[in-house]
Amino acid sequence: MNKLLILPITAILILSCSPKKETKAIEYDYSDVDDLTIFWNDILSVESDKYFAYIYSPTCGHCNEIKQDVITYALVNKGTLYFVPFNKMIPIIIDRTLPLEKDKVEDLGIVGTPSMFLVVNHVVKENYVGKKEIVKTLTND
């Protein structure tokens, strides 16, 4: 009887020690959203009534921390978020309310990266600054 129990117990012990299969999450890169990337000058010209314009820099630590969340949102909600790579032509401003209700690119600017505008009918309606505010907005949208 004892010999019969040894075999199943040994099998259970061996199986419990086997390495578990790890499910690896998909890692996205900005190249995965090339079709959703626009230039700063086109930020108010997208053919959509309502969308987010996400301004980022590939060298920005905070941008990289939320990169997976933002790209996933954009891929799941196609056509509702566009990526704007930061460049030296984008004005840096101090007052985050400055871009609100503006309908000309020349009147826009960002406080820093990451930043995100909500654009409705080619007018900036909201300005989100920083990783926490952006992730919160996309999570609640």
List PLM regions with ranges.
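Positively charged n-region of N-terminal signal peptides that target proteins for export
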Residues: 1-4
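C-terminal motif of bacterial Sec signal peptides marking the signal peptidase cleavage site
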Residues: 15-16
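N-terminal leader/targeting and pre-domain segments
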Residues: 20-50, 138-141
